[in-house]
């Protein structure tokens, strides 16, 4: 029987080949065939991929992202003869749960998830439970262009070594934006943001964790409020959480009464706070995409006077990745798709403010001149004016306990 897509799949039948890894022998026994593992020439991988169908599991909450994936589907179809179906997720954990269940049921090949857009705690879970195919990423032909020096999070996912088990796809960093006419002097630290909220009650908020940017807001505060961050980059322990999070809860206890609806309610999604900003309900808003304000200006949802900034002492940032589950039956098609996503052409289109505006993982100085020219060099209104240093994410094991403690304290 053919594999069936899970609910919420889109553009079905388009012709194209999205938080310790397996050993080479283990992956082989579980049904994968990888260039990295077998030494097979890339042309052979492409030939085997032709005619395969790939179920790509990726967050489906953005029209821009969905449209980009549809474009990529068409391109890979035309060039490589592989099919893809975008399985739209509301939470990446859905796909992780599905792969885990298949492994428990003994389904060691022909799984229902072929590619997953992933990082952080979800990657950590899949790596620890040997749910990932590979290593494969650093043997993809287009990996040669990845900026592994200037963007070290391309090899470290929430402080967990990637080890070739997922391929970097895009960059993210905690960013704020506001209308310069209303906020001429932006708050450039979490302490300054609290002062701003006190001076402008009801005009600041953040999404309710576990919404991603809400959790990122917690991590930014956690990192800024701890001068010794060493414990945050080690696997979570209850004792470490109690020590490190004490200043965070004190900060939030003082901040919440000055937030939107006095901190008794929180928006559910990033889209909700974007709309509140567009409506003038908020004076400052948060994002994990440094180009979001520019996107909003181009889409005529924000005024040209909107500008973006990051925290002066550094903003938490990471890379998001594409991974292949251990039990895919179409490893060749999955690798062809991911390799295309790493191409200068696909990365430049993804970085285009008018298309998506997701920052590239590539190093401009590694690209031939023609490919480098595809990336816009002129800054646009709303783009971050003075990018801050990246603060590495805490270890991925901190995310769930941090969210649970927030919900226990503030989620009622």
What is the meaning of each model-derived region?
Residues 51-54, 82, 111-114, 200-203, ...:
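Loop/turn elements at helix/coil->beta-strand transitions in domains of secreted/extracellular proteins
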Residues 59-71, 87-94, 113-271:
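Extracytoplasmic ligand-binding site segments that recognize negatively charged/polar headgroups
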Residues 260-323, 327, 366-374:
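Extracytoplasmic/periplasmic substrate-binding proteins
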């Amino acid at each position: 029987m053919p594999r069936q897509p899970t609910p919420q799949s889109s553009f079905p039948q388009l012709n194209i080949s999205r938080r310790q890894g397996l050993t080479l022998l283990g992956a082989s026994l579980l049904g994968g065939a990888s260039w990295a593992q077998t030494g097979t020439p890339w042309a052979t991988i492409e030939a085997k991929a032709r005619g395969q169908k790939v179920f790509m599991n990726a967050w489906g909450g953005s029209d821009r992202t969905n449209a980009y994936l549809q474009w990529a589907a068409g391109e890979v179809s035309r060039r490589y003869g592989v099919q893809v179906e975008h399985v739209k997720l509301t939470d990446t954990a859905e796909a992780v749960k599905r792969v885990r269940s298949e492994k428990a049921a003994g389904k060691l090949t022909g799984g229902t998830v072929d590619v997953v857009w992933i990082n952080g705690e979800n990657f950590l879970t899949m790596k620890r439970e040997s749910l990932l195919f590979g290593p494969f990423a650093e043997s993809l032909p287009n990996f040669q262009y990845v900026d592994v020096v200037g963007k070290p999070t391309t090899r470290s996912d929430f402080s967990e070594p990637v080890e070739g088990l997922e391929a970097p796809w895009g960059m993210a960093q905690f960013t704020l934006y506001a209308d310069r006419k209303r906020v001429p002097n932006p708050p450039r630290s979490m302490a300054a943001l609290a002062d701003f909220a006190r001076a402008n009650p009801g005009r600041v908020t953040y999404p309710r964790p576990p919404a991603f940017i809400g959790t990122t807001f917690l991590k930014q505060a956690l990192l800024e409020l701890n001068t010794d961050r060493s414990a945050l980059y080690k696997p979570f322990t209850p004792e470490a959480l109690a020590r490190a999070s004490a200043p965070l809860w004190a900060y939030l206890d003082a901040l919440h009464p000055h937030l939107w609806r006095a901190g008794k309610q929180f928006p559910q999604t990033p889209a909700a706070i974007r709309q509140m900003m567009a409506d003038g309900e908020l004076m400052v808003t948060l994002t994990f995409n440094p180009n979001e304000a520019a996107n909003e200006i181009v889409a005529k949802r924000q005024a040209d006077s909107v500008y973006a900034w990051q925290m002066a002492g550094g903003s938490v940032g990471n890379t998001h990745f594409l991974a292949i589950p251990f039990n895919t039956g179409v490893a060749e098609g999955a690798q062809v798709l991911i390799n295309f996503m790493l191409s200068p052409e696909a990365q430049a289109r993804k970085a285009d403010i008018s298309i998506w505006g997701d920052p590239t993982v590539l190093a401009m100085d590694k690209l031939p001149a023609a490919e480098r020219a595809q990336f816009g060099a002129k800054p646009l209104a709303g783009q971050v004016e003075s990018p801050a240093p990246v603060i590495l994410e805490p270890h991925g094991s901190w995310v769930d306990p941090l969210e649970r403690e927030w919900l226990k304290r503030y989620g009622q």
